[in-house]
Amino acid sequence: MNNGDIRIEKIKLADLYDFACKTIANPTFKKAAPIPLIRALAQSKNPYGRPHDVVLLVAYCGDQCVGYQGLLPGLLKTEVQTSRVYWGMAWYVIPEFRRQGIGNRLLEEIKNTKIDYITPQMTASAESVFRRAGYKDLGRLTYFQLRVDRLNFSTGFFDVIITFLRKKATYPKIISSGLMRFNRLIYSITKRVLYRQAWQSSHRRQKPNLRWKVVDQIDESVGAPLNWQVKGPSFLRGVEVVNWMLKHPWLVPKSEKKTDVANFYFSVTREMFTYVAIAINSSDSRRTKGFLVLSVSKKKTKTRVKILDSYFNNPEDNEIAACLALRYAKIFLADRVDFPVSLEKYFKQMTGFKKLIKKQSHLFMFYPASSQSPLAVNIGKIAFNYCDGDTAFT
């Protein structure tokens, strides 16, 4: 096979959902479906997208889809202008066609499209491919993760026992299942005790003049300042994008999964997935304090709470985000909690948390439309956000 055998199709935003519908039960996409219906529908509603924006590159060899690269339109805000950027997502080549230049061909097609392109969160192997293709580091986002699953001390002990028992041909399987249930019980009790202590401590720190309620959408008048709370260059994430995310999630609980493509490499389901949008007011409900958006997901046996978007009229109220995140971590017995650098001190002051907190980072790589594009001239100046790109959706 040579590059002449590969054909790249560019799908525009206006055509994305119809294209996704055509991939269902289509033999061309038997081995690789470029986008599921739930994502196509959501992306077609992107408030920062335009009908003519190219949002998907599909690679074909003969009559078979062998790879794809998604593009998510976004905006870069600087002191002088707002300009368009495109976030990379869902870059994939089917196993039997890897190391044959298809991944590079997709990356070259992005260059030829002349867009300000950014890709966040990639594997080490993908990073090496991007570097060889000429993509450069844009910077790193730092955040923190509370890893309560480190307290699951008994797992290793019981694993040793179960492994030993399984070598015995006659051992009753009920023994291993009983040990696993006992391990889950111990860990569950440990989490309950830890979160109860943290919640009580956190709740005492909050002023009594506080009310909150879960809402379907964030009031635009409340969230309007979100666009400008970061000084200097940053990727715009206004309240319109937050509400789009809340209305059109990319993930659904497995129990709610409906007909969709069968061969999309990246998951569209979780054992559990939900957003929690919270409007926060003073005790008399006359004064708006701000809002908070969390996501709660369960993948296999691990439950994760993420602090996504928040805004407070008074920056000193920022700790409310941590307090409410702990409340939901307690409710769902989260194994991990992702939170921003601004809340590091708060979380480390909670009883038992300090040694469970781990610093994390995401690498952003880019390829500019030109050497003088808005993205290119702001390298080193951009403030990153945890929700940049498609992170909040996944």
Predicted regions and their residues:
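Extreme N-terminal starter segment of soluble prokaryotic enzymes
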Residues: 4-6
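Active-site/acyl-donor-binding loops of N-acyltransferases
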Residues: 55, 116-173, 247-249, 253, ...
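Acetyl-CoA-dependent GNAT
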Residues: 71-78, 294-300
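Conserved acetyl-CoA binding element of GNAT-fold acetyltransferases
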Residues: 82-95, 301-313
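Conserved acetyl-CoA-binding loop-helix of GNAT-fold acetyltransferases
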Residues: 93-115, 315-328
